[in-house]
Amino acid sequence: MTTDTRESAKVAIVTGAGHPDGIGAASAKALRDQGYEVITFDLEGADHAVDVTDAQQVATAVQAVAADFGHLDALVNNAGVGVGSANLLEQTSEDLDLTLAVNVKGLVNCCQAAIPHMLQTGGGAIVNVASLCGLRALPAIPHAYTASKFAVVGLTKSMALEFGPNHIRINAVCPGSVDTQMRSKAISLLAEQEGISLEDAEALETSTISLGSAATPSEVAAVVAFLCSENAAQITGAAIPVDGGMTGGF
């Protein structure tokens, strides 16, 4: 790729994109399919090894991307964890601290590093990967995870108000059941909590989905890519469910 092409192509950073079967990797692919130059961050398996809880690591990596391409147009905050017990009395301080550090502090670190570059070039788009658990509480989900995703939705809305005048659009996607490792863990927790088999737990969870099946990472990624695109030019501060109708009656 020539220098001129690098400088003219839109550039996106996607965090939490190291797992090949996750929403982050799918989002990176969807953005590349739209013509973006995409740089991925994760602890391993990504273009840059970055711990999003470390503000200096994040700032250094974002600066390197902006310096390499000359600008930054989009940020997808996908890095997240869901750890610990769904029983409040069994939740440890370590699990709470890690969940909030990655899911909330990590997101803020990335936004604080990326937004100054967007301000310099007159705008950009940020998509925060929240969760259906950021819109409503669900059974068999660690309380710290639910709290962190409500925080992501709140941050999305408040940051959208602050940076809208600067033409930086900030939205959240709220996936419901997605066919990832995190879903498998949630089904295991549900089975344990209800005292049922994994097969019955999966059937119970699937029964709450109006469309009858869990989403694929690529289906969530399609919404992420849309929100980064000019087709979403008038959308900011939104928290969009991608849940197969799980919130249909909510």
PLM regions with names:
Residues 131:
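Residue(s) in the substrate-gating loop at a strand-loop-helix junction
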Residues 86-88, 95-98, 126, 205:
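Substrate-binding pocket helix/loop in short-chain dehydrogenase/reductase
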Residues 116, 161-162, 233:
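Alpha-helical segment proximal to the catalytic Tyr-Lys
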Residues 164, 169, 235-237:
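Short, small/polar-rich loop/turn modules that mediate ligand/substrate recognition or access, typified
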Residues 2, 82-85, 136, 213, ...:
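Short C-terminal tail/terminal secondary-structure segment
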